[in-house]
């Protein structure tokens, strides 16, 4: 693609997409065929987000309280998915929830909490920096698109239940 448009992400992405389409066309495949082949090889991943909006000064306080509650008392599980590791980027710590072992993240401090779950599933919480919101991002791996969709929907409901 070259380096002539470093700050033009959309242009670079379009060029990369066209290059991929040409590559797979030579192999008798569409981009969809290639994506399905990657799913079959690596798994079906699905991500979503859940946002809670709380307006005003009380809302900002409530958002801070939710983050502090999750930080000080991380959930042991979301539904039947046990939290394996808990990352607190603000305090630069990763806690193995089974052994209690602590290591550092080695990354810049940020008000972000990340929960590692079994089978490549995860949940991440962070307050918005520009709006009165707290956002929860979730990801799962399934054996099919339908399985991944069902898993991410269940994880979303399990996260809501913890809150």
Positions of PLM-derived features:
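Phosphate-binding and adjacent anionic-ligand microenvironments
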Residues: 1-126, 133-135, 144-149, 156-163
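Active-site beta-strand/loop architecture of penicillin-binding DD-peptidases
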Residues: 139
């Amino acid at each position: 693609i070259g380096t002539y448009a470093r700050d033009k992400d959309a242009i670079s992405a379009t060029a990369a997409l066209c290059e991929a389409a040409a590559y797979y066309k030579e192999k008798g495949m569409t981009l969809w065929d290639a994506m399905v082949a990657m799913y079959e090889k690596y798994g079906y991943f699905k991500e979503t987000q859940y946002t809670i909006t709380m307006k005003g000064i009380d809302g900002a306080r409530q958002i801070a309280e939710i983050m502090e509650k999750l930080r000080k008392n991380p959930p042991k599980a979301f539904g039947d998915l046990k939290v394996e590791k808990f990352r607190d980027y603000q305090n630069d710590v990763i806690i193995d929830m089974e052994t209690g072992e602590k290591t550092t993240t080695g990354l810049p401090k940020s008000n972000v909490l990340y929960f590692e779950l079994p089978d490549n599933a995860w949940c991440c919480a962070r307050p918005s920096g520009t709006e009165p919101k707290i956002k929860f991002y979730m990801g799962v791996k399934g054996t099919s698109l339908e399985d991944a969709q069902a898993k991410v929907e269940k994880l979303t409901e399990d996260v809501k239940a913890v809150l």
